[in-house]
A protein has these predicted regions:
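Surface-exposed acidic/polar loop and edge beta-strand patches at domain peripheries
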Residues: 1-113
Length: 113
C-alpha cells in the first residue's frame, strides 16, 4: 500500500484482511469504502458512503459463510450459490441465471467464478 501523508483523505488500499475468514481487500477514501471478497472471486461485500456511514448493499441475515468451513449438502441446482450468498454485489461470469450447458460446458447458477 502506498500512503500519501500530504493527502490524508486520499485512497487507501488494505489487503490481507478478511470477513468471517474469507480473504478480502478494502479500498477507501473519505467518501467511499468498498470491501471486495477476493476469497470468493470478486464479490463486492460492502459499498459504504463514509460521511453518512450507510452501506448501500443488501446483506443476508446469515452473512458471509467461509466455503472452507461449510459443508454443502444440497443437490438442487442453484443451491450452492444460495448456500454461500451473503448479499452484496456479485460478478456473474460467464452465466447470469439458471444452470445451463453452453458448447458442452456445464455452467452453474450465476456462473462459475
Amino acid at each position: 500500500m502506498v500512503r500519501n501523508e500530504t493527502n490524508p483523505t486520499g485512497c487507501r488500499v488494505r489487503d490481507g484482511t478478511s470477513v468471517r475468514g474469507v480473504p478480502s481487500v478494502t479500498l477507501e477514501n473519505a467518501h467511499v469504502k468498498v470491501v471486495v471478497l477476493t476469497g470468493k472471486g470478486a464479490d463486492v461485500f460492502e459499498f459504504r458512503h463514509q460521511p453518512s456511514d450507510t452501506d448501500l448493499l443488501f446483506k443476508t441475515p446469515w452473512g458471509v459463510i467461509d466455503p472452507k468451513t461449510h459443508v454443502h449438502d444440497s443437490f438442487e441446482p442453484g443451491a450452492t450459490f444460495m448456500d454461500f450468498y451473503h448479499g452484496g454485489w456479485q460478478e456473474l461470469l460467464p452465466n447470469a441465471g439458471r444452470p445451463c450447458a453452453y458448447k458442452g460446458a456445464e455452467l452453474g447458477f450465476h456462473g462459475e467464478i
